[in-house]
Every structure is written in structure tokens, then in C-alpha cells.
């Protein structure tokens, strides 16, 4: 599979891709790890020729995009961190209450609350760079006495979200390779145009476009 996968710049006009298999590969991509399991991403599977043409133009009409039969756009959604953190917290809390020994439930619940209700909001919140500077100062002070997370500027946390999204995209491309389908990841694109085409909210960011 790894030997087979290549970034393909031109796609066949006669051999049609199976959209259902692409959907299956996208389902498999959901198994990719993401930081704190927050899943701060969305995926848009584009199959309509008109929209594909618009996306291809926004990708500077690269041949891999203009000849693609389908396009998948990977989006980051850092703005949804509170909603996603709550979902992960609720799921894990239920697991603790069902399966943990009774004497350990309070301790494990407290750790879960500290992480998803305090630390995650502290790390992922944004306010014109101000909160990042505050986090950096806290990190430096804590770092004198114990190991601590240093990359806490708002730009650092944005990078974390994009890295997690990239893991999902890579898992998708490997799954496609397993189906003997070729893909091509594109980073050359007009992100604002793609956001407008897909009618994305302000907090969304285009992370990667994959032609297939």
C-alpha cells in the first residue's frame, strides 16, 4: 500500500471512480488520531462537476485538480473546541461511571474535568493573540520547576489543529491507496475562494485539498 501510493497529477477520463468507496475511505479516516480526540475538523466530499470546476480554479487550475473526478476538502474547526470537548468529556464520564471501580470514580472524574473543562478551554481559546501571550508567560513560569508544554501561542495551537487534520487526510489517502485509487494532496489554493464556494463559517480554515 505504501509503495503503491503516489501523488498523481493527471486522472483518467474513462475509468470512473466509485463514490461509495471514497465514502468508505473517508469513514476509515475517522479512525485517525487527533489531539485530545477533539476531532476539530470537517471533511467535504465534492462530487458535483460544477463545484469541482470551481474548486479546481481556486487551486490555480492545477492539472491534478482540473482532471479530478472527485475532490475532498479537509477543514479545521478550532472554533468548535468547546462543543467537541464537551462531547469527549460526556463520553468518557459515562465510561468511568459504568466501568471504573467505585472508589476511583471521584478521582478519575476530577482528572477528566480538569483536562476537558479547564485545560482544553485554556489552551484553545483565542483573542487576537492576547491569550497566547498570557499562556506563554504561564508556561515559562511553570517550566522552571517541571516539564511543561511550551508551544502555547495562538499560532501554536492553530498548528496543532492543522497537524491533527493532516493525520486524517493522510489516513484517507492511504485508505484510497488500499482500494487502488490514486490521490494528490494540494496546498496551493486560494483558501478564501474555497471557503466562499463551500459556504464555510468564519472560524473554519481550509487545511488541505485532495484530488482523486
Where are these regions (language model features)?
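Acidic, surface-exposed loops and disordered segments
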Residues: 1-212
Amino acid at each position: 500500500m505504501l509503495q503503491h501510493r503516489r501523488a498523481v497529477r493527471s486522472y483518467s477520463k474513462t475509468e470512473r471512480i466509485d463514490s461509495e468507496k471514497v465514502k468508505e475511505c473517508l469513514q476509515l479516516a475517522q479512525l485517525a488520531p487527533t489531539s485530545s480526540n477533539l476531532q476539530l475538523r470537517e471533511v467535504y466530499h465534492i462530487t458535483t462537476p460544477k463545484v469541482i470546476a470551481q474548486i479546481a480554479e481556486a487551486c490555480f487550475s492545477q492539472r491534478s485538480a482540473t482532471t479530478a473526478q472527485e475532490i475532498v476538502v479537509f477543514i479545521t474547526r478550532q472554533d468548535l473546541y468547546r462543543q467537541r470537548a464537551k462531547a469527549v468529556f460526556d463520553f468518557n464520564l459515562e465510561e468511568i461511571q459504568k466501568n471504573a471501580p467505585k472508589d476511583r470514580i471521584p478521582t478519575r472524574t476530577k482528572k477528566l474535568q480538569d483536562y476537558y473543562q479547564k485545560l482544553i478551554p485554556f489552551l484553545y481559546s483565542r483573542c487576537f493573540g492576547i491569550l497566547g501571550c498570557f499562556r506563554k508567560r504561564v508556561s515559562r513560569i511553570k517550566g522552571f520547576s517541571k516539564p511543561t508544554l511550551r508551544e502555547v501561542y495562538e499560532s501554536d495551537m492553530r498548528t496543532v489543529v492543522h497537524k491533527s487534520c493532516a493525520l486524517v487526510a493522510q489516513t484517507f489517502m492511504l485508505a484510497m491507496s488500499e482500494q487502488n485509487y490514486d490521490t494528490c494532496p494540494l496546498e496551493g489554493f486560494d483558501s478564501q475562494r474555497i471557503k466562499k464556494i463551500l459556504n464555510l463559517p468564519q472560524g473554519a480554515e481550509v487545511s488541505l485539498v485532495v484530488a482523486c
